[in-house]
Amino acid sequence: MAHLQRTFPTEMSKGRASFPKGFLFGTASSSYQYEGAVNEGARGQSVWDHFSNRFPHRISDSSDGNVAVDFYHRYKEDIKRMKDINMDSFRLSIAWPRVLPYGKRDRGVSEEGIKFYNDVIDELLANEITPLVTIFHWDIPQDLEDEYGGFLSEQIIDDFRDYASLCFERFGDRVSLWCTMNEPWVYSVAGYDTGRKAPGRCSKYVNGASVAGMSGYEAYIVSHNMLLAHAEAVEVFRKCDHIKNGQIGIAHNPLWYEPYDPSDPDDVEGCNRAMDFMLGWHQHPTACGDYPETMKKSVGDRLPSFTPEQSKKLIGSCDYVGINYYSSLFVKSIKHVDPTQPTWRTDQGVDWMKTNIDGKQIAKQGGSEWSFTYPTGLRNILKYVKKTYGNPPILITENGYGEVAEQSQSLYMYNPSIDTERLEYIEGHIHAIHQAIHEDGVRVEGYYVWSLLDNFEWNSGYGVRYGLYYIDYKDGLRRYPKMSALWLKEFLRFDQEDDSSTSKKEEKKESYGKQLLHSVQDSQFVHSIKDSGALPAVLGSLFVVSATVGTSLFFKGANN
């Protein structure tokens, strides 16, 4: 039976009320990972449609986002789920080819695509959920990729500005929170340096099967153009009078780094370089108008430069800093690299390490090889941003825990709805944010879990699950709430302070447990073990555990 061995920290015992007034709690998504319906509504083809269909072997399960989790047809029921678990914000992205099928505004706007996003936004607002809209989450129209190489060309800057302008015009009367770019580091490095993600470009010395690309060069060009496109979009945004109290920024995805050998000055300095190359690469220009000095020194003339006018547009172009945080690693300084085979990784002169010099991991390993549950890393990043960039407003635009397919993690191996590891991960990171706000003075203003639903996870396909809701891909994409969803529902209740009596707490706990039990009784996992004779024990333990967990208790782990 599960062993309950931890209570909430006292300072978080009031749940949502422990955070500043107006603090946003939400979930995050992206168009290609959620929507499906790739051939509906006059949608054009994106680079990810092309990549997943042309190179299925680069997706772990050879899948694609053609259907994804069918948010296109099910958004109303999914928004009800957000409301049910007391979320007050939702981060979604616009699919560029859904509103501009041919990439350029002068080639035609899809009014069907515009209507879809208008309907989603209106449904969110009707449920008192604040939309945070991302303009670019990697699904550039394939037409622009074919025509001039997408973000490899400066031509993309004008086309992105026109696309962003369309979004502001059509949705800005109801949307005040915007994000221009999601994880430009991933898009540049994975798309143009390692070739793992669309469009899959890199040098032959990185991947012998590569069709085209130039590692150590193209990623810097792509990121440069992304930053210039961002600046142009922000200039348009700030001239839109109908956008009231608007805020716009970029969602970065830094890791936190600790030195492989704390006694080695090179490893300590390597951590600083690694932060410059991952976070500073795209954050520094928007705050200071130029790339970090470490990058300019290391990359040399392969790193593009900004004109004075471009720098002026970039400085102050973010109203908040978006942070997508998942994990932390150790960094070991590299003494020598081959200058004839440059990559982004060798340019920073470090290796990422899963263990330190003593063979110890930075924290408990999560659901993938490079994932570690280390909330302290998030707190350190928040303090780093405050110290380095003058304490700007911060949104945690993504944070989540992925588990590989149907991996078993405890006694509850028969049912993934008992996601104790995810629950622990989320609670730990919310606590780290709380500490950063109240003890460190960091201006964190929102937290978005990745993600509401299991979904298409890029190169991992459907083999990694991050959702608060389990998607049954074998049974019509049915949704089942996991323990983490019900825990968040309880944590985010608006009536925390008015519901403190013992009888009401016990009533809530019992209801909480029954909800989870009901959500999984008819799932494929329960059906699959009926013949094993283990069903009564599994469901019995499930009920006992879930009925016991309320606002004051949560799972630390499950032990026999």
UniProtKB/Swiss-Prot annotation:
It comes from Arabidopsis thaliana (Mouse-ear cress). It holds the Pfam family Glyco_hydro_1. Possesses beta-glucosidase activity toward 4-methyl-umbelliferyl-beta-D-glucoside in vitro. Possesses myrosinase activity toward indol-3-yl-methylglucosinolate (I3M) and 4-methoxy-indol-3-yl-methylglucosinolate (4MO-I3M) in vivo. Component of an inducible preinvasion resistance mechanism that prevents penetration of the nonhost fungal species B.graminis and E.pisi. Involved in indole glucosinolate (IGS) activation during pattern-triggered immunity (PTI). Functions as a myrosinase for the breakdown of flg22-triggered IGS. Belongs to the glycosyl hydrolase 1 family. The keyword Repeat does not apply. The gene is BGLU26. This is Beta-glucosidase 26, peroxisomal. Its EC number is 3.2.1.21. The active site is at E183 (proton donor), E398 (nucleophile). It is found in: Peroxisome. It catalyses: Hydrolysis of terminal, non-reducing beta-D-glucosyl residues with release of beta-D-glucose. One of its GO terms (biological process) is defense response to bacterium. Gene3D superfamilies: Glycosidases (3.20.20.80). SUPFAM superfamilies: (Trans)glycosidases (SSF51445). The keyword DNA damage does not apply. PROSITE patterns: GLYCOSYL_HYDROL_F1_2 (PS00653).
